[in-house]
Design a protein with these regions (language model features):
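Noncatalytic, helix-rich "gating/capping" subdomain that lines the substrate-entry/channel surface
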Residues: 88-381, 385
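Intrinsically disordered, low-complexity linker/terminal regions across diverse proteins
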Residues: 226, 261-264, 283-287, 344, ...
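Bacterial signal peptide processing site
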Residues: 20-22
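C-terminal motif of bacterial Sec signal peptides marking the signal peptidase cleavage site
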Residues: 15-18
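Active-site-surrounding "flap" and adjacent substrate/cofactor-binding loops of secreted or lumenal enzymes
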Residues: 24, 38-44, 49-114
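Hydrophobic/aromatic-rich, well-ordered segments within soluble, folded domains that form packed cores
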Residues: 35-56, 187, 191-210, 402, ...
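Short secondary-structure subsegments characteristic of cysteine-rich extracellular domains
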Residues: 12, 63-85, 217-236, 505-511, ...
Length: 678
């Protein structure tokens, strides 16, 4: 899920199949030998062999629970953003209402800890009192709708996005939620670590209520009320694996049917306050969860619901209040749950806020300074090389029939590719940044986001809209638009290196591109057609063969012990593992195509093929705390970095050839037991 900053000369060489790069630049291997641990054996743990030196040289600092090459790029990006933002924040003549004024003022407000500490709980006091004043269930429904506008999401989440069955149109949808720990397992499982986190959460709730000015007795009542409601919501929620099934989470209905299916939910009040009075249809993602929401609202005493709603407000606002709120918030969510030891400095948190609120304003400045426009077209050519490679692989699949191949190739040919930055930027003119409280500005920003979102309901999908900002170090595939997107910030080493040859670049950014393409054909993506509709285009026999091959991947990752007594979740991580697998296969073939007429030489003692796999492994170098391993294993659809290497490569035949891996090596998997899909 990554890409890289690159410059013209290398880009031309990388993207012109068979071009002789030696004529244009003196290139290196791009592999930092210091990253290696040459005492390790490639066939015992390729991750340790390729990344052991990096891991040793980059011990975790207190502000991180996990730190790897992605985080290094994010740190670099954040420094760049700081320079851009701080320059505007230092000016006193920014025109009122201008982008410069909004960026500069929001940063200064976020940095003003003196004012924040003077205010204490004051910025949310009136809202807490308003919750106290709620008189009945109708008021509860009205408050849910109002609070969602401000970025607070009690009970459930409502959003607008493409209709999976009619992907050209946007639709209002609901999604389970309303639980402070975010994942249902924290409420339902009873192992020692989960039980400890649950106990710490209750202590956290009590401390936060007391910081907000409530006495201990009220704080303890709040703990009981919150845990009662959130545990009920958690029991009704779907698991992380169940949420990956697009058909199970598609339950579109007209408003008449909605009211019939959920008769005790006051939809009229909710939709009127939400600004959706004339809504015609909605998708209820998880019906059992929504039924429980209605049951909770109708059966839990009003006073307990008020405490739950007040907790939602306190929890949402904590990061934008005084230091004592921030410290307590960090203590639970970061220290207890993830193992972090120290909060990031205020400037980093402030930059992140400005980036989150005014992402495309900051992104436009970032692109103008750090990403040349010409790079966009060169990247498009590289993507086309990978598309060609994936097409070749699809045509050569022995297990797939011709009718399904034809549909797969049609889908591949219609990929919508986004590189670097959007062609059209968002208009933030309606967003006001004022010199009042930090939280008030965050609420206005959330209201602006909400208004923009609601305006899309029932309207055509804008396929030119970006779901990430240019300064985001990541990449994505969106099934309903059949698009792959590579923001500018990921276009830099170690993902792409202008001074390195094709072996390194195809091993790193090439695999990233192939990874995103393969998402269009993983266990979820394969269920969407070329137009982004949830529609079966597979023959029954081919679908069965795919599922059988995917199960091999599930079983392999289920067998991996990520911590003592804790195994990876092969079903949860299936889509990402298939994408890694496909990315490696597709990019390796593209690499061989690109160098067929001008073979690369051995450099630094490594063949081109070896450098390809070393570059891939180096992308996943990182350190991680035990608490974070356990947390991510519960909720993250991505495998841990180590296993994106040691779990992925044993399935790749060309890796065995490159490093002479044999039956005697611990990582060896017999050929007939390996995953073989794309």
């Amino acid at each position: 899920m990554k890409v890289t900053k690159y410059l013209p000369i290398l880009a031309v060489c990388l993207m012109t199949t068979g071009c002789n790069s030696k004529k244009e630049a003196v290139l290196t291997s791009g592999i930092d030998l210091a990253n290696l641990d040459t005492t390790a054996m490639p066939g015992t743990s390729f991750y340790q062999y390729a990344c052991g030196g990096w891991v040793k040289d980059h011990p975790l600092t207190d502000e991180y629970s996990r730190f790897g090459t992605f985080d290094m790029l994010r740190e670099n990006s954040r420094e760049q953003l700081k320079a851009l933002i701080a320059e505007l924040a230092s000016k006193t003549d920014n025109a009122p209402g201008s982008a410069a004024q909004k960026v500069g003022d929001l940063y200064n407000i976020a940095m003003d800890s003196v004012k924040l500490n003077q205010e204490g709980v004051a910025p949310i006091k009136a809202e807490l009192e308003a919750i106290d004043a709620l008189k009945d269930k109708k008021d509860i429904y009205a408050y849910i709708a109002e609070s969602q506008k401000k970025g607070i999401r009690p009970y459930f989440t409502m959003f607008v996005s493409a209709d999976d069955m009619n992907s050209s149109m946007n639709m209002v949808q609901t999604y389970q939620g309303g639980i402070g720990m975010g994942q249902r397992d924290y409420y339902l499982e009873d192992d020692e670590q989960t039980a400890n986190i649950r106990n710490k959460y209750q202590e956290h709730i009590a401390k936060m209520f007391q910081l907000a000015g409530y006495d201990e007795a009220t704080a303890q009542k709040a703990v009981k009320a919150v845990m009662n409601i959130e545990t009920r919501l958690a029991k009704a929620a779907r698991s992380q694996v169940e949420l990956r099934d697009p058909h199970a989470n598609y339950n579109k209905m007209d408003i008449e049917t909605l009211k019939k299916n959920f008769p005790t939910f006051d939809w009229d009040t909710y939709f009127t306050i939400s600004g959706l009075k004339d809504l015609k249809e909605v998708n209820i993602g998880q019906p059992a969860a929504m039924k429980e929401v209605a049951d909770v609202i109708n059966t839990v005493p009003l006073e307990e619901q008020k405490l739950y709603l007040q907790w939602g407000l306190i929890d949402a606002a904590a990061s934008y209040l005084s230091d004592d709120f921030e410290a307590q918030n960090f203590d639970f969510y970061s220290r207890t749950m993830s193992g972090k030891k120290e909060m990031q400095p205020r400037w980093k948190r402030s930059v992140s806020t400005v980036d989150g609120v005014l992402g495309e304003v900051v992104g436009q400045m970032y692109v103008e300074k750090y990403f040349p426009a010409a790079a966009k077209e060169r990247m498009v050519t590289l993507v086309k090389n990978l598309q060609t490679s994936l097409g070749e692989r699809i045509k050569g699949l022995e297990w797939m029939s011709e009718p399904t191949k034809e549909k797969a190739l049609e889908k591949l040919a219609t990929f919508h590719v986004k590189i670097g930055y959007p062609d059209k930027w968002k208009d933030y003119s309606a967003l006001e940044i004022k010199n009042d409280s930090y939280w008030a500005n965050i609420e206005r920003a959330n209201q602006w986001d909400y208004n923009e979102m609601i305006a899309k309901a029932g309207k055509p999908v804008d396929k030119d809209e970006w779901l990430m900002t240019p300064q985001t170090v990541n990449a994505y595939y969106n099934p309903t638009t059949n698009e792959i997107c590579f923001p500018a910030a990921i276009l830099q080493p170690p993902f792409f290196d202008m001074n390195a040859d094709d072996a390194m670049n195809y091993g790193a950014i090439g695999v990233v591109i192939g990874h995103e393409m393969t998402h269009g054909f993983d266990d979820q993506g394969r269920q969407y057609d070329k137009d982004g509709n949830l529609k079966d285009w597979w023959t029954e026999e081919d679908a069965k063969k795919f599922e059988e091959r995917a199960q091999v991947m599930v079983n392999f990752f289920d067998s991996i012990e990520v911590a003592p007594g804790v195994h990876a979740n092969g079903e949860l991580t299936l889509g990402e593992n298939i994408a890694d697998h496909g990315g490696l296969q597709v990019s390796y073939q593209a690499f061989k195509n690109a160098t067929a007429n001008a073979p690369l030489e051995t450099v630094d003692g490594f063949t081109p093929e070896q450098r390809f796999f070393l570059a891939y492994a180096n992308v996943w170098a990182g350190n991680i705390r035990p608490e974070e391993i356990l947390r991510l294993t519960k909720l993250d659809p991505h495998s841990l970095g180590k296993w994106r290497v040691d779990g992925a490569l044993p399935q790749i035949g060309t890796w065995y050839e490159a490093f002479n891996i044999t039956e005697q090596d611990p990582m060896f998997v017999p050929k007939d037991k390996r995953v073989s899909i794309w």
